[in-house]
Amino acid sequence: MTNDADVALGIEAARRLAHLGLVDIQPGLTDAEFATIERRFGFEFADDHRAFLAAGLPVWTPGQDDHPDKASWGWPNWRQLDSSSTLHEQVDWPLATALDEIQHGEWPPGWSRRPHDLARRMAKAKRLLADVPRMVPVYGHRYLPAGRGSSGHPVLSIHRLTDTIVYGNDLAHYIDQEFREPRVTVPLWRDYV
């Protein structure tokens, strides 16, 4: 069951993004589109993420998405399910990078003992990862966990399994962190920021 506060958080994030005027925003996703996406990828959007995408589908940030160091993949265009290998790469990235690092020796601390045999290690990792919530792309390498009936999770920047940081306390805070330029008030120094 969806909570009004969860929906409000997603709508507030969408409002903040639209207010900045930096992004091409298409009409929001419909219930039928959500159902198709969720069936295709095997996850359900968290309630705040769903409300955000229902309010409007951000698809491009001129200037920001043109620079590979800033966004890499940019906004996922959930309407290009068949024509975009980029969307599939973006959705698959968290699991792919986790498995890649595990193959090269990394082992999450909470996962008991690491098998020495590579085949056993990878099989065990795949079993354990199957129980971890899927991460759903928000923008570039920024992700929220999947899960209908959940909301308010921190947005994570996932470049690698071992290079994961919190990029926003929640979706609305993330929009401010990623796209709103802070106003520097210190004389002299503000001219050099």
Question: What label would you give each PLM region?
Answer:
Residues 149-193:
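Glycine-rich, aromatic-bearing surface loops/beta-hairpins
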Residues 51-53, 146, 164:
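Residues in flexible loops and secondary-structure boundaries
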Residues 140, 145-147:
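Acidic, serine/threonine- and proline-rich low-complexity regulatory tracts
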